[in-house]
Amino acid sequence: YLEKDELAGVLGELHERARTQRAGQIAGWPARWQRMAGLAPADKAAADVRGVVWRDEEGRARGAVAYRLQEIEGEFRATLQVRHLVADSDEALRGIWSFLVHHDLVNRVSVDLRPVDDPITWLVADQRAVTTRIHDHGWLRILDVPAALQARTYAGTDLEVVLGVTDPLG
């Protein structure tokens, strides 16, 4: 487990490394990591935030999660609510997921804003126990379409694509 100050730093550091591996990810900012780690003064759930880091054999942080347990009234169980989960390697991601799904006295893990290809469905024995929901999150307006497309790399670059864009605002 990590102290909240350390958790905020690790989340930011890992996000910066991991976001370059996935198109469309944006940079984070210190206030975001402080909020995820439970350091925001207005956060009513801040006291309940916990953090865990997954380290490789050299001791480097490769995955981390900020979460809180929400007790289910009348039961001796809780829902584990993930605030932020980040990993810069497949092994670290599997390690963090393993920690979450094997947490004591938890009968539900709730995670928002995961990629559609997140491997959790394939990491559990009962795939029917995993429920996913797809919804919009990041919206953006690309002002320079050619520059945006040229900044990416593409597999199978022998392909030629013609793209038309109509934007009444410019």
Feature map (PLM): residue ranges:
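Intrinsically disordered, low-complexity, positively biased terminal segments
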Residues: 2-170
